[in-house]
Amino acid sequence: MNKILFYLFVYGVVNSAAYDLLKAPNYFEEFVHRFNKDYGSEVEKLRRFKIFQHNLNEIIIKNQNDSAKYEINKFSDLSKDETIAKYTGLSLPIQTQNFCKVIVLDQPPGKGPLEFDWRRLNKVTSVKNQGMCGACWAFATLASLESQFAIKHNQLINLSEQQMIDCDFVDAGCNGGLLHTAFEAIIKMGGVQLESDYPYEADNNNCRMNTNKFLVQVKDCYRYITVYEEKLKDLLRLVGPIPMAIDAADIVNYKQGIIKYCFNSGLNHAVLLVGYGVENNIPYWTFKNTWGTDWGEEGFFRVQQNINACGMRNELASTAVIY
């Protein structure tokens, strides 16, 4: 059963207070103007409108039934498959070597604060935009190292995703990669440069890294099997922000609030866990995304805890230790 039919089956057909499906043509023209869309032909424009209309219907249904809110945004004329193919990039091969040490977190969660967020301690760097390059794995990996550097040295830095795309021969650049193999590649490369020394191009290119300009070096990496989702709270406070794998299909049109309904049809995107809290008696996780600050809650999103939202527990969480 697809996700739209699931919502209809459980809740019935509803109307959104914010959007009216009958006004889809008007919304679409506003969308085309706002995002400067040029489809090249009326045939292609009509095709995009039909996709837009389908996405609008999903937005309306979700807005009525989820605690989060969804909106028409820059992805609204793309099918979910197109968005996943162009704007994510997590690849999950059938088998990978355990270069990073695997740790099983099988003890019950400890007693910690009800709320915690590394952003409040100024240990999370600015939200970036990967664009149409499947390098979420590089962004999430380096975002965790940027935070580790900030925790250790009290300084925010901006590391080079382009170096990872060009010089990480374990992963596949804009064609995808994995979190733990990215850490493996950094250890093998010897370190990572600043983005200012190796700027982002959103495309695969020849490796041009300068080992004399490495700012961050990784000495160890770990993968965690979490028996209890709540155990991630202890891990987050202990090691810093954690890169994790999710299925991004249900967050594409997200605007704000806590997502209660995020299914997992296959992991495809890497994001960074930065905090957790409680709002209106709903416990949530906070993630940093890589789709720019014009998406979601200024580039961040929240999901309900303890429901394996977006499949967040289906792949091992990965972290690394810097020198």
From Swiss-Prot:
Catalytic activity annotation: Endopeptidase of broad specificity, hydrolyzing substrates of both cathepsin L and cathepsin B
InterPro entries to which the protein is assigned, alphabetical: Papain-like_cys_pep_sf (IPR038765), Pept_asp_AS (IPR025661), Pept_cys_AS (IPR000169), Pept_his_AS (IPR025660), Peptidase_C1A (IPR013128), Peptidase_C1A_C (IPR000668), Peptidase_C1A_papain-like (IPR039417), Prot_inhib_I29 (IPR013201)
Listed SMART domains: Inhibitor_I29, Pept_C1
UniProt EC number: 3.4.22.50
GO molecular function: cysteine-type peptidase activity
Propeptide, residue positions: 17-112
Taxonomy, superkingdom: Viruses
Signal peptide, first to last residue: 1-16
Active site: 136, 269, 289
Positions of disulphide bridges: 133-174, 167-207, 262-310
Enzyme class: hydrolase
Residues bearing carbohydrate: 158
Keyword Hydrolase: yes
Keywords for the protein's UniProt record, in alphabetical order: Disulfide bond, Glycoprotein, Hydrolase, Protease, Signal, Thiol protease, Zymogen
Processing after translation: Synthesized as an inactive proenzyme and activated by proteolytic removal of the inhibitory propeptide.
SUPFAM superfamilies reported for this sequence: Cysteine proteinases (SSF54001)
Function: Cysteine protease that plays an essential role in host liquefaction to facilitate horizontal transmission of the virus. May participate in the degradation of foreign protein expressed by the baculovirus system.
Family of the protein in this entry: Belongs to the peptidase C1 family.
Protein name according to UniProt: Viral cathepsin
Organism encoding this protein: Rachiplusia ou multiple nucleopolyhedrovirus (strain R1)
Lineage: Viruses, Viruses incertae sedis, Naldaviricetes, Lefavirales, Baculoviridae
Recorded name of the encoding gene: VCATH
